[in-house]
Each structure stands twice: as structure tokens, then as C-alpha cells.
């Protein structure tokens, strides 16, 4: 059962009596919160070099959380779906400061080989360029998603840090 707002069943300000179903609803809400969906997040806090005009998969180095064995360090670029379903995948990437070119972040799934999220923007001249990208994708068990980046500064640049999370939304 999905979350139910208790205020829709009982409004203390109106003097309505608590319905008998309220106890069941609260119990189901607590079970929903306790049995959270499959989710994982990882980060990279060290520099990863990105060559000019080269699409590169980001490699994550630190697990932030993982309740379903979705991110595995032997494959540090991949977030794996443990069961079939719809998933939200989100990433945030910070490129080193440089005055020129574009910075791009793609979200790619292994089943189709295509991207389901993309964000491009011009570099900022005086500060690092940070990009957030997210998308919803249908995955089968053991499919995986990755974050890819590219930059066109004319030089080799680094990614200062990156974070990504995969969350199962439902079946």
C-alpha cells in the first residue's frame, strides 16, 4: 500500500471521530516506511580526468548507502537493478573551472544502450561547472545504469566530485 495522509481520515479540529480503519492505515503507513524501496547512492571525492571531446563513464569510489546490493565496487561505474521495475536515477557532477567549451552529463541504461537523461551547458569562466541530471527508466533485474560525461574545453579537465543515486519507484 502507498502512503496515506492521516489528515484525510481524521481531522481533530472538526471533532470528527477516528474511524476504525485509522489503526489499519497507520499500521500500513509504518510498514511502508519500514520496508523502504531498493535504493543506493555512491560518490567520488577525488579527481577523475576527462580528456577533451571524449565520452567517459564516471567511476564512483565511496558508497553512501546501499540497501539492495545495487552498487558494487568491482564495477564502480554501474548501479544495478535488483528487481524489475521503474527507477529514478539522479547524478550531480562538478567539473574543474575552465573558461571555454561545453560540459555534458548523460544517464545511460545497459538494456537499450541509449541515454534517458542528458544535460549540457556552457562552462562558467570563474568557477567550477556543476550539472545535475535525472531520469526515470524501466529496468529488468540485473540491468544497470551509468553516468557519462564529456567536455570540450580543448584541454584535459577533471571532475572534482560526483554523486549518483538509484531508487526503485515501483513495478
Language model segments and positions:
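Extracellular jelly-roll beta-sandwich "head" domains, especially the C-terminal globular C1q domain
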Residues: 2-171
Amino acid at each position: 500500500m502507498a502512503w496515506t495522509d492521516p489528515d484525510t481520515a481524521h481531522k481533530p479540529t472538526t471533532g470528527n471521530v477516528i474511524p476504525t480503519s485509522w489503526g489499519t492505515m497507520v499500521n500500513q503507513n509504518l510498514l511502508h516506511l519500514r520496508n523502504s524501496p531498493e535504493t543506493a547512492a555512491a560518490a567520488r571525492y577525488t579527481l577523475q580526468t576527462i580528456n577533451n571531446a571524449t565520452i567517459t563513464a564516471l567511476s564512483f569510489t565511496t558508497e553512501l548507502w546501499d540497501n539492495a546490493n545495487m552498487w558494487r565496487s568491482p564495477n564502480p561505474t554501474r548501479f544495478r537493478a535488483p528487481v524489475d521495475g521503474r527507477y529514478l536515477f539522479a547524478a550531480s557532477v562538478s567539473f574543474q573551472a575552465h573558461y571555454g567549451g561545453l560540459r555534458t552529463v548523460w544517464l545511460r541504461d545497459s538494456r537499450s544502450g541509449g541515454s534517458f537523461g542528458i544535460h549540457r551547458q556552457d562552462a562558467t569562466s570563474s568557477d567550477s561547472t556543476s550539472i545535475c541530471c535525472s531520469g526515470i527508466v524501466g529496468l529488468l533485474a540485473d540491468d544497470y545504469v551509468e553516468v557519462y560525461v564529456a567536455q570540450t574545453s580543448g584541454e584535459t579537465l577533471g571532475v572534482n566530485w560526483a554523486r549518483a543515486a538509484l531508487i526503485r519507484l515501483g513495478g
